[in-house]
A protein has these predicted regions:
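Sequence contexts marking disulfide-bonded cysteines in secreted/extracellular proteins
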Residues: 19, 40-42, 98-100
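Hydrophobic helical h-region of N-terminal Sec-dependent signal peptides
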Residues: 6-12
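Structural detector for short beta-strands of small beta-barrel domains
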Residues: 23-52
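Beta-strand/loop nucleic-acid-binding surfaces
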Residues: 58-76
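OB-fold/S1-family single-stranded nucleic acid-binding modules
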Residues: 91-119
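C-terminal motif of bacterial Sec signal peptides marking the signal peptidase cleavage site
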Residues: 14-17
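Positively charged n-region of N-terminal signal peptides that target proteins for export
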Residues: 1-5
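Flexible glycine-rich surface loops and low-complexity tracts that mediate binding to linear polymers
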Residues: 77-96
Length: 119
């Protein structure tokens, strides 16, 4: 009897911790607008248009206006004013670029994948 109870509890615990994750490689978490080349660092910056709390959770820092320097933004998306959908991760120290500290300073993000939003 104790063995059956133990097995039943174990099964319940195992299944209660299972949840479905979205592992579809064609989905994007976030949306942003490309702002243009940042004059301080020479790298394009983007402004997230939604999900700022998710950006903060991924990156670990946030800005009031949602602007970040976007390392690894694909060349075909480096056009001011276009809307994009993208996945990001926190940038590693070794991936940071040099900035002049003469202009506005924004946190960096690393773009994993991105594509243009077609209206």
């Amino acid at each position: 009897m104790k063995t059956n109870l133990f097995i039943s509890i174990l099964i319940v615990l195992l299944f209660s911790n299972c949840h479905e994750e979205n592992n579809d490689p064609n989905t994007f978490q976030l949306q942003a607008e490309v702002l243009g080349s940042n004059p301080d660092c020479g790298v394009f910056s983007i402004k997230f248009t939604s999900e700022l709390d998710k950006v903060k959770m991924i990156v670990g820092s946030t800005t009031l206006d949602g602007i970040y320097i976007a390392k690894n933004l694909p060349i075909e998306l480096q056009q001011s004013g276009i809307k994009i959908k993208l996945d990001i991760r926190k940038i590693q120290d070794s991936e940071l670029g040099a900035c002049t500290a003469m202009g506005p300073s924004y946190p960096w993000i690393y773009v994993i994948k991105a594509e243009k939003i077609n209206n």
